[in-house]
Amino acid sequence: MRRFPMLDSHFKKEEFKKAVKENVKMLYRKTIDEATQQQIFQAVSLAVKDVIIDNWLATQKQYEKDDPKIVYYLSMEFLMGRALGNNLINLTAYKEVKEALDELGFDLNVIEDQEPDPALGNGGLGRLAACFLDSLATLGYCAYGCGIRYHYGLFKQKIEDGYQVEVPDNWLKDGYPFELRRPEYAKEVKFGGYVRVEYDAATGRNRFIQEGYQSVMAIPYDMPIVGYNNKIVNTLRIWDAEPITDFRLDLFDKGEYHKAVEQENLAKNIVEVLYPNDNHYAGKELRLKQQYFFISASIQEAIAKFKKNHDDLHDLPKKVTFQLNDTHPTMTVAELMRILLDEEGMEWEEAWEITTHTCAYTNHTIMAEALEKWPIELFSKLLPRVYQIIEEINRRFILEIQNKYPGNQEKIQKMAIIYDGQVKMAHLAIAGGYSVNGVARLHTEILEKQELKDFYEMYPEKFNNKTNGITQRRFLMHANPLLADWITDHIGDGWITNLPELAKLKVYADDKKALQEFMNIKYQNKVRLAKYIQEHNGIEVNPHSIFDVQVKRLHEYKRQLMNILHVMYLYNEIKAHPEMDFYPRTFIFGAKAASGYRLAKLTIKLINSVADVINNDASINGKLKVVFIENYRVSNAELIFAAADVSEQISTASKEASGTGNMKFMLNGAQTLGTMDGANVEIVEEVGAENAFIFGLTADQVINYENNGGYDPMQYFNNDPDIRNVLMQLINGTYSNGDFNMFHEIYDSLLNTNCSDRADTYFILADFKSYAEAQKRVEAAYRDSEGWAKMALLNTACAGKFSSDRTIQQYVDEIWHLDKVTIEE
């Protein structure tokens, strides 16, 4: 069977082989036999890019001809994953290139491994943005991703003595073949200084002029976003920072070395890392700089692009939407106002009318800590004119609140954009945009009824839900080619662009042969992951064991701690009852903790310490293994999703906005073990409660405890010997070589209220026994191999709702109102 139809005559095999050889010669002055694997990767990528650029040009020409409305998707993160394999799949040329490289003596899988994961994001926020760009291109909509070209990303995670160590992720060290530098579109971005007000007699208005500022040049680098089998190539534009003035040789010659490179360092600092530690003033200032830097450059570019083809900026909302991915880009509201007022000479009312019909905001969190607030002192000093504009937005917004709720001072306190010395960015986005969306039905309900209740009461028409989705082209076709081929053999390939077609697989739920094939594919993927674990961790795991997986950003609300405490409980059970019939389990973790997040980093140490004890205990005969996968990222995630039996989605109910890992596991036939939180609720609706393992407090119960009190974790400690035993092991040296203090902070966080932090903030002890019971149900279900296979197949068959294609179409229909574009032959 030919896995992919042939799209492009450029991929005639002989021509492609010739292009690779020529590229090796041109780039490295070598023959193909002398080239390293990295050099072959660069040469192959350039040959592929050559085809992409033809389509990229054709796409731009079509957009110029059709003049469609554009969505600018503004995000601090784009977690793209490797581009080579994904581009080949979307060009429908994977098979041909694989064969061509085979004939040249190279393995495409090995060549793909030479590509670094672009370090442009960290967690679900950035991966969602990447999936959305894939879907926008595949569906044929004109879109630009806008972000920052971080030189070192968040960090590369090393595990040393069980602890996370952060090292720079130098992903650009060999050059990145899938980017184009575009200095002709550079934009100046200004920081600091002061605002001079000058009366303009001609217009009878004040002019506001920023002076005494420092500035940097924002230089765009463009990455192609290839649509599936449609010749459309959209653009991810990431901004690098360069100094306005070059290296000062005169200062250097005087020995003033620091001053000679001052401008260069100012620029470099902005783009070095994603999410610099903001536990101090300098870190906060740098984060704010980063946000304004990419927002200002992106909005300037969007306005310039609009003015090339249109005379009247009042038509901007008909042709442009700025989608703000979380609170980081919400300064867009004020920056757009600045440009319209100061550079385009508009009156406030007309500028506000344009802005509030152009900006739309996606809320990604219920966690108050992530709804960004900036100290006035910092904000007004770094961005004096933008701050003035926000002050005026706030003044007018408060008047609007007073008109609607006369005499209600409490409303003003809760809703003001500037209050108590802070600028509240989510409030700015809601006041200054026309749409506010949550990312799963439960999440949106909680926003409307609880977190953003006052705003919902004032602007109910702005609020809507868009449940997240994932691209099946990366997370099934590329991540799990064996399963992708099997599905296509059974139901055709329509699912590649219409995921609900997976429902056709339901007819195989009682077909023993089909179930056997399905589980054999799962086994082969487990063998593949076991090999990766052996190579990277030096741990031998049994592919016949249950692969129980939790991979996601490390945060207390995601409750990796509950997972590892349960592993400790299981280990205690096996040690106490060595004769018990226990089905072998492999618990797999992968997570990065923010560099300044002490408790999260200590949880990683605990996981690795427990792993050291359990994996080296010969007396349990390998019944239990614990693996922490270092430097979790998109490329190893693809191996993990394909191999998982159990998908751990165990956040405290009401805390996870949506989650998308849950969807990737489901698509690949893993069963969800989780709380009724985020998109888990909708997953259970699709697959049926009988095909998932649900436990724990509900969102309403959690919110009730938080609002009214009454939760005492000490009750569980005092009344449940299993829980008490596990928690005592945190402080009796069991997993710390006799060091009683190593994990004391974790113990304290669960049992001792500390200042504003309530003991067991995320209800781990309340849910522990319910979780353990659900785990017992998992084991019982897995022992029934045919029943388990049916559940696995149905999870894949019911995943159709969770494509980002569906999500994007909903954004288009209900928020953006874009027109499809087709490339004319």
What does each of the following model-derived ranges do?
Residues 2-825:
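A conserved ligand/cofactor-binding region detector
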